Amino acid sequence: MPTRMITKDEVTLWSEGIGDPADAPLLLIAGGNLSARSWPDEFVERLAAAGHFVIRYDHRDTGRSSRYDFALHPYGFDELATDALAVLDAWQVRAAHVVGMSLGNTIGQLLALDAPERLLTLTVMLGGALDVDFDADLEAALKGEPSVSGLPVPSRRFLDMMMLLQQPAGTDEELLERRVEKWRLLNGEGVPFDSDEFRRRELLAAGHAGTFDEPIVHHMIPQPPVSRGAELARITTPVLAIQAMCDPAAPPPHARHLADRIPGARVVEIENMGHALPLAVHEPLAAAICAHTRAATV
């Protein structure tokens, strides 16, 4: 598959295009601390087979993109959003269907607000609306208190995952097993966890990045001001909010809360899906995304 290295303000971003460039472009924006490889090849190929030219890329500080000392070179969500636009520019894409998960869910909302002319549609999942203070909700969950937002806080599985990432691991094999365990916790209890499937993916991701060490820098990025949530009402891009019904990070009804703030936004629920992309959810997830993109182009 063709790849492109993109230089933007001294930051280099790795990107890849999958499918027929003549098809409708679809940009995948990954979650925090995750590279383009977090979008499984099998899932990407489904989207391409459905008539999309799929573009995925490594966030800065992941995969083959630039890595810096965050203390010396801090950045925020605005920079991550402009990275996504730089990727579209590099592939000479005027406007694209955009799909964002987790951290990409937040970036997608910012793009719909600040660069609506670059979006044909937006699909978001595995995250909350801009008016939800996730950091405060996470703190409440750690204390066993209700959320500030009134929405469900991250579950025990998500808290266990956060604790796992703080544990030391020495050898590559130990790092690999920790990565697999992270996904077991995020996968939730709805879909049986296939450790071999995720071990294979993590080997590919580590090979892509050249290291088994996982970045953690995106946990240091302050979330956008919750005041931006009031702006969601002016979004005109067709929006689909996908609710993973077993998501330990953003449990129901986070997607409904988001959709209720955007005119015309729709919600699709994926039963048994957690905060991960196992093979078992690829078919319904791709079907929901492709139905949304097709509806906007009819």
Swiss-Prot record:
Catalyses which reaction(s): rhodomycin D + H2O = 10-carboxy-13-deoxycarminomycin + methanol + H(+); 4-O-methylrhodomycin D + H2O = 10-carboxy-13-deoxydaunorubicin + methanol + H(+)
GO biological process: antibiotic biosynthetic process; daunorubicin biosynthetic process; doxorubicin metabolic process; glycerolipid catabolic process
Keyword tRNA processing among UniProt keywords: no
Keywords assigned by UniProt, alphabetized: Antibiotic biosynthesis, Hydrolase
GO molecular function, one term: intramolecular lyase activity
Domain AB hydrolase-1: 25-277
Catalytic activity, EC: 3.1.1.-
Pfam families linked to this entry: Abhydrolase_1
Pathway(s) annotated for this protein in UniProt: Antibiotic biosynthesis; daunorubicin biosynthesis; Antibiotic biosynthesis; carminomycin biosynthesis
Function, in words: Involved in the biosynthesis of the anthracyclines carminomycin and daunorubicin (daunomycin) which are aromatic polyketide antibiotics that exhibit high cytotoxicity and are widely applied in the chemotherapy of a variety of cancers. Catalyzes the removal of methyl group from the carbomethoxy group of rhodomycin D (10-carbomethoxy-13-deoxycarminomycin) and 4-O-methylrhodomycin D to yield 10-carboxy-13-deoxycarminomycin and 10-carboxy-13-deoxydaunorubicin, respectively.
Family statement: Belongs to the methyl esterase DnrP family.
UniProt-recorded name of the protein: Rhodomycin D methylesterase DauP
Origin species: Streptomyces sp. (strain C5)
